[in-house]
Amino acid sequence: MLQPKRTKYRKKQKGRCSGLATRGDRVSFGEFGLKATTRGPITSRQIEAARRAINRYIRRGGKIWIRVFPDKPVTEKPLEVRMGKGKGNVDHWCEPIAPGRVLYELEGVSEEVAREAFRRAAAKLPVKTTFVNRTVM
Protein backbone atom coordinates (compact mmCIF):
# COMPACT_ATOMS: atom_id res chain seq x y z
CA MET A 1 0.00 0.00 0.00
CA LEU A 2 1.07 3.56 -0.66
CA GLN A 3 2.15 5.80 2.20
CA PRO A 4 4.89 8.40 2.74
CA LYS A 5 8.28 7.21 3.96
CA ARG A 6 8.45 10.04 6.47
CA THR A 7 6.42 13.16 7.25
CA LYS A 8 7.12 16.38 9.10
CA TYR A 9 4.16 15.79 11.43
CA ARG A 10 2.54 12.48 12.37
CA LYS A 11 -1.07 13.74 12.41
CA LYS A 12 -3.06 16.29 10.41
CA GLN A 13 -6.32 18.13 10.90
CA LYS A 14 -9.31 16.89 8.94
CA GLY A 15 -9.69 19.99 6.75
CA ARG A 16 -12.07 20.55 3.84
CA CYS A 17 -11.54 20.06 0.12
CA SER A 18 -13.36 22.77 -1.86
CA GLY A 19 -13.27 24.03 -5.44
CA LEU A 20 -12.01 22.32 -8.56
CA ALA A 21 -8.62 20.68 -9.07
CA THR A 22 -6.06 23.24 -10.23
CA ARG A 23 -3.14 20.81 -10.55
CA GLY A 24 -3.17 17.30 -11.98
CA ASP A 25 -6.22 18.07 -14.12
CA ARG A 26 -4.72 17.18 -17.52
CA VAL A 27 -3.60 13.90 -19.10
CA SER A 28 0.18 14.42 -19.06
CA PHE A 29 1.87 11.04 -19.52
CA GLY A 30 -0.44 8.57 -21.30
CA GLU A 31 -3.07 8.65 -24.05
CA PHE A 32 -6.14 8.03 -21.88
CA GLY A 33 -7.07 9.07 -18.36
CA LEU A 34 -9.58 8.45 -15.57
CA LYS A 35 -10.78 11.80 -14.22
CA ALA A 36 -12.75 12.40 -11.00
CA THR A 37 -16.04 14.32 -11.32
CA THR A 38 -16.96 14.41 -7.62
CA ARG A 39 -14.95 15.14 -4.48
CA GLY A 40 -13.96 12.87 -1.64
CA PRO A 41 -11.07 11.08 0.02
CA ILE A 42 -9.46 8.05 -1.64
CA THR A 43 -7.57 5.65 0.62
CA SER A 44 -4.35 3.86 -0.30
CA ARG A 45 -6.24 0.55 -0.38
CA GLN A 46 -8.74 1.90 -2.92
CA ILE A 47 -5.90 3.24 -5.10
CA GLU A 48 -4.24 -0.19 -5.01
CA ALA A 49 -7.50 -2.08 -5.71
CA ALA A 50 -8.21 0.08 -8.77
CA ARG A 51 -4.62 -0.36 -9.99
CA ARG A 52 -4.97 -4.14 -9.72
CA ALA A 53 -8.29 -4.06 -11.61
CA ILE A 54 -6.64 -2.11 -14.46
CA ASN A 55 -3.56 -4.35 -14.58
CA ARG A 56 -5.66 -7.50 -14.53
CA TYR A 57 -7.66 -6.33 -17.55
CA ILE A 58 -4.85 -4.93 -19.73
CA ARG A 59 -2.56 -7.94 -19.05
CA ARG A 60 0.85 -6.27 -19.59
CA GLY A 61 -0.54 -4.65 -22.72
CA GLY A 62 0.27 -1.06 -21.84
CA LYS A 63 1.78 1.29 -19.29
CA ILE A 64 -0.14 2.70 -16.33
CA TRP A 65 0.54 5.86 -14.34
CA ILE A 66 -0.95 6.46 -10.88
CA ARG A 67 -1.36 10.24 -10.60
CA VAL A 68 -2.46 10.38 -6.94
CA PHE A 69 -0.50 9.62 -3.78
CA PRO A 70 -2.06 9.27 -0.30
CA ASP A 71 -0.16 11.73 1.89
CA LYS A 72 -2.80 12.61 4.48
CA PRO A 73 -2.95 10.51 7.68
CA VAL A 74 -6.39 9.47 8.98
CA THR A 75 -6.55 8.77 12.70
CA GLU A 76 -8.94 6.51 14.57
CA LYS A 77 -9.51 5.83 18.24
CA PRO A 78 -9.79 2.21 19.42
CA LEU A 79 -13.18 0.57 19.94
CA GLU A 80 -15.04 1.28 23.19
CA VAL A 81 -12.83 4.22 24.16
CA ARG A 82 -14.45 7.33 25.63
CA MET A 83 -14.21 10.70 23.93
CA GLY A 84 -11.29 12.96 24.79
CA LYS A 85 -7.78 11.94 25.89
CA GLY A 86 -6.21 13.27 22.71
CA LYS A 87 -6.22 12.45 19.03
CA GLY A 88 -6.21 8.77 18.03
CA ASN A 89 -3.44 6.84 16.31
CA VAL A 90 -2.87 6.92 12.54
CA ASP A 91 -5.10 4.22 11.02
CA HIS A 92 -4.58 4.68 7.27
CA TRP A 93 -3.56 7.20 4.60
CA CYS A 94 -5.77 8.99 2.09
CA GLU A 95 -5.70 11.62 -0.65
CA PRO A 96 -8.44 14.29 -0.83
CA ILE A 97 -9.70 14.37 -4.42
CA ALA A 98 -11.24 17.45 -6.04
CA PRO A 99 -13.40 17.31 -9.18
CA GLY A 100 -11.27 17.45 -12.33
CA ARG A 101 -8.32 15.51 -10.91
CA VAL A 102 -6.81 12.82 -13.18
CA LEU A 103 -6.36 9.65 -11.12
CA TYR A 104 -4.87 7.14 -13.58
CA GLU A 105 -3.40 7.27 -17.07
CA LEU A 106 -2.86 4.54 -19.67
CA GLU A 107 -0.99 4.19 -22.95
CA GLY A 108 -0.14 1.38 -25.32
CA VAL A 109 -3.68 -0.04 -25.46
CA SER A 110 -6.70 0.61 -27.67
CA GLU A 111 -9.44 3.00 -26.58
CA GLU A 112 -11.95 0.15 -26.02
CA VAL A 113 -9.52 -1.70 -23.74
CA ALA A 114 -8.73 1.50 -21.83
CA ARG A 115 -12.45 2.31 -21.39
CA GLU A 116 -13.22 -1.14 -20.00
CA ALA A 117 -10.16 -1.14 -17.72
CA PHE A 118 -11.12 2.28 -16.31
CA ARG A 119 -14.75 1.19 -15.93
CA ARG A 120 -13.62 -1.72 -13.75
CA ALA A 121 -11.28 0.54 -11.77
CA ALA A 122 -14.03 3.12 -11.22
CA ALA A 123 -16.12 0.47 -9.46
CA LYS A 124 -13.42 0.29 -6.76
CA LEU A 125 -13.33 4.06 -6.14
CA PRO A 126 -15.62 6.17 -3.90
CA VAL A 127 -15.79 9.11 -6.36
CA LYS A 128 -17.59 9.33 -9.70
CA THR A 129 -15.25 9.35 -12.66
CA THR A 130 -15.18 9.92 -16.40
CA PHE A 131 -12.97 8.71 -19.26
CA VAL A 132 -10.81 11.35 -20.99
CA ASN A 133 -8.51 11.37 -24.03
CA ARG A 134 -5.33 13.35 -24.32
CA THR A 135 -6.68 15.03 -27.49
CA VAL A 136 -9.77 16.31 -25.66
CA MET A 137 -7.68 18.26 -23.17
From Swiss-Prot:
It comes from the Bacteria. The keyword Transcription regulation does not apply. Coiled coil: none annotated. GO terms for biological process: translation. One of its GO terms (cellular component) is cytosolic large ribosomal subunit. One of its GO terms (molecular function) is tRNA binding. The keyword rRNA-binding applies. Keywords: Ribonucleoprotein, Ribosomal protein, RNA-binding, rRNA-binding, tRNA-binding. It holds the Pfam family Ribosomal_L16. Belongs to the universal ribosomal protein uL16 family. PANTHER family: 50S/60S RIBOSOMAL PROTEIN L16 (PTHR12220), LARGE RIBOSOMAL SUBUNIT PROTEIN UL16M (PTHR12220:SF13). Part of the 50S ribosomal subunit. HAMAP family: Ribosomal_uL16 (MF_01342). Binds 23S rRNA and is also seen to make contacts with the A and possibly P site tRNAs. This is Large ribosomal subunit protein uL16. The lineage of its organism: Bacteria, Pseudomonadati, Pseudomonadota, Gammaproteobacteria, Chromatiales.
